């Protein structure tokens, strides 16, 4: 009798735990740094020829990944990196304005990163692409619950991070390369 009661209690706990998950559906978030950019104008440069080629390679590489939403920063280089994939998928990329950290302008303000993560989490079960910057992608991965938070070299443009979010604050990060080096 005790064994039967324990089994029933265990089953009830499993059911309660399942409902306590807030119907969270796993999602995959693809994150890339913008493609290679021109040196001028310094404020908001477009992509170099190599960057345009890389953005087209990204579109080819991710076209079958089931991406439903694309987020970029307000800068031309992120929008131009996302544009070929958005066009191929019939999507419009959503731009999120990133603000600099007041104590260190080379870093992104935490509230900007939180806004990106909140937008991602508003899309349960959807695969999302985020095109960002070397100083924003690691923070987004960390806030998604990534188990590995990379440092992105300023001279590298070929990293693709795939973050599988299993539950709030629990995620697995896979890093791979795409396009030519």
Residue ranges and their predicted role:
Residues 131-133:
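Short beta-strand segments
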Residues 1-23:
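Bacterial Sec-dependent N-terminal signal peptides
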Residues 23-124, 137, 143, 148-181:
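Active-site-proximal alpha-helix that buttresses catalytic centers in soluble enzyme cores
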């Amino acid at each position: 009798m005790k064994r039967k009661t324990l089994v029933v209690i265990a089953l009830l706990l499993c059911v309660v735990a399942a409902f306590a998950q807030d119907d969270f559906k796993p999602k995959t978030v693809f994150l890339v740094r913008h493609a290679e950019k021109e040196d001028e104008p310094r404020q908001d440069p477009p992509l170099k020829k190599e960057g345009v080629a890389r953005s087209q390679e990204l579109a080819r590489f991710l076209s079958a990944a089931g991406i439903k939403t694309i987020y970029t920063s307000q800068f031309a280089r992120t929008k131009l990196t996302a544009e070929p994939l958005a066009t191929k998928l019939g999507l419009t990329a959503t731009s999120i304005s990133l603000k600099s950290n007041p104590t260190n302008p080379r870093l992104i303000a935490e509230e900007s990163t939180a806004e990106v993560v909140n937008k991602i989490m508003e899309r349960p079960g959807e695969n999302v692409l985020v095109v960002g910057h070397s100083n924003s992608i690691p923070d987004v991965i960390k806030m998604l619950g990534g188990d590995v938070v990379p440092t992105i070299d300023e001279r590298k443009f070929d990293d693709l991070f795939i973050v599988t979010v299993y539950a709030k604050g629990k995620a697995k990060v896979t890093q791979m390369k795409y396009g030519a080096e």
